[in-house]
Amino acid sequence: GSEMCIRDRPVGADASKLNVLDDLTDVTPAGSNARLGESETTPGESAERQLQYDIKYPYDLSHEKVSEGDRKLAEAMTMVADGPALAVLKDIYRRQDVLELVGVHSHIGSNIHDADAFIQAAKRMMLLRKTFYATDAYTLPEVDLGGGYSVAYTDGEDSMDIDVELGRLADAVSTVNRALGMPAPVISFEPGRWTVAPTGVTLYRVGTVKPVELSGEAKDKSGNPVTERVYVSVDGGMSDNIRPALYGSDYTARLANRKGSEQTKLCRVVGMHCESGDIVVNEVRLPADIKRGDILAVPVTGAYGRTMASNYNQALIPAVVGVGEAGAHVMIRRQTIDDLLSWDVSE
């Protein structure tokens, strides 16, 4: 959805998601008995805090779990400039005693390959900015156009060409503001996943290796008939990377501890959690001689891996090791059973 970025002068509360307009009056700054709809503040509080107002699109932009901006975006975005968003801006602007309105933010989806959808969203945001200026004579100084830039997780996929596509987006923003007679805002982008995903590699130790005969109608992801799939279990899974189970995200894997046989077999790398959806890599060809104790490397796990890791089934979250020209060092230590037990409350 699109979000209104506002900053509240009272300090102390964590960032909050406001899902309905009425919530703006229901947030109480820490250390104060006042609500944001009132003018009372705690003496000495002056730092800014960011709040966000979500505007949910009433459309499925592409995928039921991970939206990718597409042709439905233009229709869905009409609400941004034509109704709810403008009403929210006006309501916030009327509360200048406790709120400072600094800009608008949009998020249109994830793993988007080019700037086309971002350009559509940007045009709507600039139109919203112009409409608000025309009615309230206030120029929103900042516009955050979000992120969701695609990353190549498997062979054959492409990452977004940031230089080319963000250049197109910046040109479009300049063009539409000239056409609207508006000064260009400060533009922000969010390239987090695009930046950090390729920097992470997760290492797993192989456990049981089990070949399973498939029916005569079975095919691989390329459509080729297959008669056997080898299930390769590892000592991790959905507790350290929830994306395959949550979104159906695809990854690949490589044998990392030795050179395997030239002959390969179709494999599915599965986790240790005894869940049908606990899949690390849905389909990959690995050396036919893969065996217990081998190390598999799953690349491009630097984003939404460790940050969404959990103690599912009381699994321990693995360590994070930084590797550079100067060598390797532990950045985050491995969890232990004592860590889990430390949360227990003794009588």
What are these regions (language model features)?
Residues S174, R178, M182-E347:
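Charged (often Lys/Glu-rich) extended helix/loop segments that serve as interaction or gating elements
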Residues L24-P29, D158-L166, L316:
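C-terminal helical cap(s) of enzyme catalytic domains, especially alpha/beta-barrels
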Residues D97-L99, L140-G147, T227, S261:
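A glycine-rich, aromatic-flanked flexible loop/lid motif
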Residues G1-I6:
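Short, small-residue-biased leader/transition segments that mark boundaries at the very start
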Residues R7-E142, A172, N177:
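Active-site-proximal beta-alpha core segment in soluble small-molecule metabolic enzymes
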Residues I108-G109, V143-S150, F189-W194:
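Glycine-rich beta-strand-to-loop/alpha-helix junction loops that act as flexible
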Residues H113-Q120, A152-E165, V196-T208, V281-L286:
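Short glycine/threonine-rich loop-to-helix capping motif typified by GTGT followed
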Residues A81-A85, F118-A122, I162, L166, ...:
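Generic structural signal for well-ordered, non-membrane alpha-helical segments
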